[in-house]
C-alpha cells in the first residue's frame, strides 16, 4: 500500500489514494476495522505515526474533484481538519487528481483550496456557525471564560496573557474542558490564545480525537482568528496566528467566509509494511 506523509504547520497526516476503494479491501484481508487500521498507523514509535489519516476518494458530485474520509489518530472520523485539508489539496494536485483550484467534499461540506506556490496552500473553510461569547466553564483547575465557534468542528477559545500561555498545562486543563458536560456529548477542541506585542496571536490547542496538545490546528487557528476579529482584539480581518510549531498561519475573515493559508511539507512517500499490524 503506497502512503504519503505530509505536514502542515506541525500537523502530520498519512494520505492514501483510495479512489478505487483499495484500502478497505486490504484492511479486510488484515482482519481489521478502519478504526483499528488508523489507530495502529498513527501510533508513534512503533508505526508510521501521525495526527490523522486521510483517504482520497471519488467525489459524490461530479463537479467536484474528490471526496475525503478523515480520521483522527484515535480512529474516530472527523467532520473537518484545516491543516489536513491543505495537505490533501497539495497531494491531489501533485498526483494529478485535481488542478490548482480545487473543490472537494468533507462531512462538514465542500472545501475550496488553492495551490499558491510549491508549498503554500490556501483553503476556504466551510462557513463558521454557532458562535457563543463569554461562556464560563468550571473545572478542577479553575474557571475559564471562553468563546465557542464551529469552524467545521467545534472549538472553544480562551484568551490568556503570554506568561499564562507559556506555563499552562494544556494536556490537563484542555482535557477537563474538552470532556465538560457543557459540550456533551461530542465534546470540543480547546484553544488557549495570547496576543503578542506585534498584534499576532500565539495559540496552543488540545485536539479532540488526538486527545492531546498538537503542534498546530488549522480549524483552531481559524476559530482564534474569528473570535479575535469579532471581539475587537484584532483591528484587521486578516489575523496572523503563530502555532506551537512556530509556523505562521494567516486567517482571513470575510463575513461568514474564513480562509486559512500556510505552508505544507511533503515528508516521505513509500510502501507500507503490513508487519506493523
Swiss-Prot record:
The lineage of its organism: Bacteria, Pseudomonadati, Aquificota, Aquificia, Aquificales. Keywords: Amino-acid biosynthesis, Cytoplasm, Isomerase, Lysine biosynthesis. Belongs to the diaminopimelate epimerase family. GO terms for cellular component: cytosol. PROSITE patterns: DAP_EPIMERASE. It is found in: Cytoplasm. It is an enzyme of class 5 (isomerase). The active site is at residues 81, 217. Homodimer. This is Diaminopimelate epimerase. Its EC number is 5.1.1.7. The record marks 155, 207 as: Could be important to modulate the pK values of the two catalytic cysteine residues. Substrate binds at residues 11, 72, 82-83, 189, 207-208, 218-219. GO terms for molecular function: diaminopimelate epimerase activity. One of its GO terms (biological process) is lysine biosynthetic process via diaminopimelate. Catalyzes the stereoinversion of LL-2,6-diaminopimelate (L,L-DAP) to meso-diaminopimelate (meso-DAP), a precursor of L-lysine and an essential component of the bacterial peptidoglycan. The keyword Cytoplasm applies. It catalyses: (2S,6S)-2,6-diaminopimelate = meso-2,6-diaminopimelate. It comes from Hydrogenobaculum sp. (strain Y04AAS1). NCBIfam families: DapF. HAMAP family: DAP_epimerase. Pathway: Amino-acid biosynthesis; L-lysine biosynthesis via DAP pathway; DL-2,6-diaminopimelate from LL-2,6-diaminopimelate: step 1/1.
Amino acid at each position: 500500500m503506497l502512503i504519503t506523509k505530509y505536514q502542515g504547520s506541525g500537523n502530520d497526516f498519512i494520505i492514501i489514494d483510495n479512489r478505487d476503494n483499495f484500502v478497505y479491501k486490504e484492511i479486510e484481508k488484515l482482519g481489521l476495522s478502519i478504526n483499528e487500521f488508523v489507530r495502529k498507523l498513527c501510533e508513534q514509535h512503533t508505526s508510521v505515526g501521525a495526527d490523522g489519516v486521510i483517504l482520497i476518494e471519488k467525489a459524490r458530485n461530479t463537479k467536484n474533484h474528490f471526496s475525503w474520509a478523515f480520521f483522527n489518530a484515535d480512529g474516530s472520523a472527523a467532520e473537518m481538519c484545516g491543516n489536513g485539508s491543505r495537505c490533501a489539496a497539495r497531494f491531489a494536485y501533485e498526483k494529478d487528481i485535481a488542478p490548482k483550484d480545487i473543490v472537494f467534499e468533507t462531512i462538514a461540506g465542500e472545501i475550496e483550496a488553492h495551490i499558491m506556490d510549491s508549498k503554500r496552500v490556501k483553503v476556504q473553510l466551510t462557513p463558521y456557525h454557532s458562535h457563543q461569547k463569554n461562556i464560563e466553564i468550571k473545572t478542577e483547575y479553575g474557571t475559564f471564560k471562553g468563546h465557542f465557534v464551529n469552524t467545521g468542528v467545534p472549538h472553544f477559545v480562551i484568551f490568556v496573557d503570554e506568561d499564562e500561555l507559556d506555563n499552562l498545562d494544556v494536556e490537563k486543563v484542555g482535557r477537563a474542558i474538552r470532556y465538560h458536560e457543557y459540550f456533551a456529548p461530542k465534546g470540543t477542541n480547546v484553544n488557549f490564545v495570547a496576543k503578542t506585542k506585534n498584534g499576532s496571536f500565539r495559540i496552543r490547542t488540545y485536539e479532540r480525537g488526538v486527545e492531546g496538545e498538537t503542534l498546530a490546528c488549522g480549524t483552531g487557528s481559524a476559530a482564534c482568528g474569528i473570535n479575535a476579529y469579532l471581539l475587537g482584539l484584532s483591528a484587521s480581518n486578516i489575523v496572523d496566528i503563530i502555532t506551537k510549531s512556530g509556523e505562521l498561519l494567516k486567517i482571513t475573515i470575510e463575513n461568514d467566509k474564513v480562509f486559512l493559508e500556510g505552508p505544507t511539507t511533503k515528508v516521505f512517500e513509500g510502501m507500507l509494511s503490513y508487519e506493523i499490524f
